[in-house]
C-alpha cells in the first residue's frame, strides 16, 4: 500500500552527508519526496511510496548513517497523494 510520511530527524545531522545518503537510499527503493536542512539544525524528509520501502528507509536513517548521530526520528504518517515525481535534496 502506498503511503506518505513526514520525518523530522534530530541530532548531529547537518553537514555530515545525511541528506545525500537518504537521497541514494530513497532512490534505490523507488521512493519520491525530498530531504531538507531546517534552521533549527534538524533535517526534514518527506517520503512517498510503498509502505514497506518507507519503513526500510526509516530503519536506514535510524541505523545506517555512518557519519551522522541520529538522536530522534519523529514520524507523521499521511495519506498518499502522489505529489512528487522524484526524490530531491534542498
Swiss-Prot record:
It catalyses: an acyl phosphate + H2O = a carboxylate + phosphate + H(+). GO terms for molecular function: acylphosphatase activity. Its EC number is 3.6.1.7. It comes from the Bacteria. The active site is at 19, 37. It is an enzyme of class 3 (hydrolase). The keyword Hydrolase applies. InterPro entries: Acylphosphatase, Acylphosphatase-like_dom, Acylphosphatase-like_dom_sf. Belongs to the acylphosphatase family. NCBIfam families: PRK14426.1 (NF011000), PRK14449.1 (NF011020). This is Acylphosphatase. It comes from Caldanaerobacter subterraneus subsp. tengcongensis (strain DSM 15242 / JCM 11007 / NBRC 100824 / MB4). The gene is acyP.
Amino acid at each position: 500500500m502506498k503511503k506518505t510520511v513526514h520525518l523530522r530527524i534530530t541530532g548531529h545531522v547537518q553537514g555530515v552527508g545525511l541528506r545525500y545518503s537518504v537521497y541514494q537510499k530513497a532512490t534505490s527503493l523507488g521512493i519520491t519526496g525530498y530531504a531538507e536542512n531546517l534552521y533549527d539544525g534538524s533535517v526534514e524528509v518527506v517520503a512517498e511510496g510503498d509502505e514497506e520501502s518507507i519503513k526500510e528507509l526509516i530503519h536506514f536513517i535510524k541505523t545506517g548513517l555512518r557519519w551522522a548521530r541520529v538522536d530522534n526520528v519523529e514520524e507523521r504518517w499521511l495519506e498518499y497523494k502522489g505529489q512528487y515525481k522524484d526524490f530531491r535534496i534542498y
